[in-house]
Amino acid sequence: IRAELAELSIEHDTNKKIGIISCFFDPKNVDESIELINNELKEFNIKHLYWRKVPTDKQILGTLARESKPSIYQGIISAENESPKDFEKKLYLFRKTLERKIAEIDFLNIHINSCSSKTVVYKGLFTAKQTADFYWDLRNPLYKTRFGIFHQRFSTNTSSTWDKAQPFRMLAHNGEINTIQSNYSWMKAREVDATSSYWKDDIQSIKPFIDNSISDSGQLDNAI
């Protein structure tokens, strides 16, 4: 990312942490989607550096995956004076607030794959071994990581879509959680009275803790 910043002549203090908002957009509404996210970044006083269209090779995709492929973008952002821990906390709060606003706008189909200064999600409707064939970033020697989480299994009780692909933001999981509905109900019941010395008043902004419209694996990821 710093190499791209230099190419684009965008100034950035290298002592400040960089974050990446990884998104799937409806190809018909890319500009509106970016505008919504940029406005929310301003509300949170998060410095936006640039948007990059993630380089991909759609030729490796099957017919269904190619026809349903979203526009894949990454928003590159920067910490200001926050510590790395506080910046990550701010990004979580930003994402939860943004997702609530997205849910209120019917015509915008936006999925936030990840929003973090520590991890970035690359996923889609293809096998694990095709990941680097589709995402050119993962063949770039400038990209380095301490670990990677891969997920090979396709959904069995829901139709496969790009946003349902794994890994999620924290984990990859095979699902089939038999107690998912009761787990969700207990979390929802406790959510009303939940308090936190870490989140303080901001705890209201990260509710609901669990999105009941997604898969059981996705709900587990919400909880983590």
Task: For each feature predicted by the language model, list its residue ranges.
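Conserved short alpha-helical segments that host acidic/polar catalytic motifs at enzyme active sites
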Residues: 1-224
